Regions:
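Residue-register detector that marks a fixed positional context within folded domains
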Residues: 1-165
Length: 165
């Protein structure tokens, strides 16, 4: 059992989770453990690690920078490390609150997309002195064991990758 299962183990828990992380009412979610989502996911549904909502600022429907970055690199959320969602979510929040108009191209100017075998894709700064976000925790070990299968109108009408590869 994952660390975050207690947040969504009841109908009331799911409702509270949806309110707290601003998931619209037309979107459904269901919990699954690591390695279990391959059997439970239906066509058109997307699997998103719970930690990306809790620590990474993931929002449904995906906001512009996050959605465009994942589409440009043809990545599904299960292929991405948490730091990617933190950076992309941070840019989406800056755009929303300050109207900066940042895009996924701005991410490419500062970060390089790398793949760590067994861990997924992550963003690494081209230059250590220049970053969009500081103060990442040293490790998220053990926090990526819980997943949500997001169904119904999670994509806001735009095509998004739902499978790896």
């Amino acid at each position: 059992m994952g660390r975050f299962k207690s947040l969504v183990d009841s109908k009331e828990g799911i409702e509270n989770f949806m309110v707290q992380y601003r998931i619209p009412p037309g979107v459904g979610i269901k919990y699954c453990k690591e390695r279990q989502w391959h059997e439970n996911k239906q066509k058109g549904e997307v699997v998103i690690p719970m930690i990306t909502f809790i620590e990474g600022g993931m929002r449904i429907p995906k906001v512009t920078v996050t959605r465009d970055y994942l589409r440009a690199y043809r990545l599904a959320p299960t292929q991405c490390a948490l730091n990617m969602f933190r950076i992309l979510g941070f840019l989406d929040t800056l755009n929303e609150k300050m109207g900066l108009g940042l895009t996924h191209y701005d991410v490419n100017w500062v970060y390089n997309l790398l793949h760590l075998k067994g861990q997924g894709y992550y963003l690494k700064s081209w230059y250590p002195e220049i970053r969009l976000i500081q103060c990442f925790p040293d490790s998220y070990k053990g926090l990526n064991k819980d997943f949500l299968i997001v169904l119904e109108e999670w994509h806001g009408g735009l095509p998004c990758s739902t499978r790896e590869g």
